[in-house]
Amino acid sequence: MEVLQQLGTYYSQNGGYVLQEFYRHFLMSVYGVLFAAIVGIPLGILIARYRRLSGWVFAVTNVIQTIPALAMLAVLMLVMGLGANTVILSLFLYSLLPIIRNTYTGIISIEHAYLESGKAMGMTKFQVLRMVELPLALSVIMAGLRTALVIAIGITAIGTFVGAGGLGDIIVRGSNATNGTAIILAGAIPTALMAVIADLVMGWLERALSPIKKKKGNFIIADRKTTSI
């Protein structure tokens, strides 16, 4: 109970600071994933077209995933210095694998009949991609973005070690303080809530964008232009 009282007191006295760091934490996470999506989605489409490249691309992105986050930040800090940009670049690198993998999987798993129908209607390769493949693969791509964002929120918490701020800054302050359990919780609880809410929202978007929806025990094709081909 004493810890809860201390936690409530901390929030009442430092609510503005916590909100500021929450916002900063969220923005860094989103920027890292957004930049990874800008690169990763086209790259996933490319290796779905030229599958010989997939082994090399996945090998590189898998190696990146094996590097501890703190070590990655330390290396990038030597190049980019302290600050949020170092964290965003780190998040960009860690977010590539789930985004590329899900884009690749979503594209190659589309039934060949849909592609042939598009070609039979006189669509160009780009039109087939834009009007058939991407809409049908969108829910799978969203699943990759969902995974990447949740991972990014967790990694951003250690960005405080390179001067990036965020909720990790509150956690570190608590770990350095005497009887700082309440301060640690003041940073850890919003971080966990952010990850849970992001996962729920992205999960809802993933289901909403799925071309196959479940209704009354039966699977039906969603009402989408691409599925009418």
Swiss-Prot record:
Q: What sections of the protein cross the membrane?
A: 27-47, 55-74, 78-100, 148-168, 182-202
Q: Which domain of life is it from?
A: Bacteria
Give the UniProt subcellular location, in the record's own words: Cell membrane
**Gene Ontology terms: biological process:** amino acid transport; transmembrane transport
Give the record's family classification.
Answer: Belongs to the binding-protein-dependent transport system permease family. CysTW subfamily.
Q: Which UniProt keywords apply?
A: Amino-acid transport, Cell membrane, Membrane, Transmembrane, Transmembrane helix, Transport
This protein's species is Bacillus subtilis (strain 168)
Which Gene3D superfamilies has this protein been placed in? MetI-like
Q: Where is the ABC transmembrane type-1 domain?
A: 22-202
Q: How does it assemble?
A: The complex is composed of two ATP-binding proteins (OpuCA), two transmembrane proteins (OpuCB and OpuCD) and a solute-binding protein (OpuCC).
Annotated function? Involved in a high affinity multicomponent binding-protein-dependent transport system for glycine betaine, carnitine and choline; probably responsible for the translocation of the substrate across the membrane.
Q: What is this protein called?
A: Glycine betaine/carnitine/choline transport system permease protein OpuCD
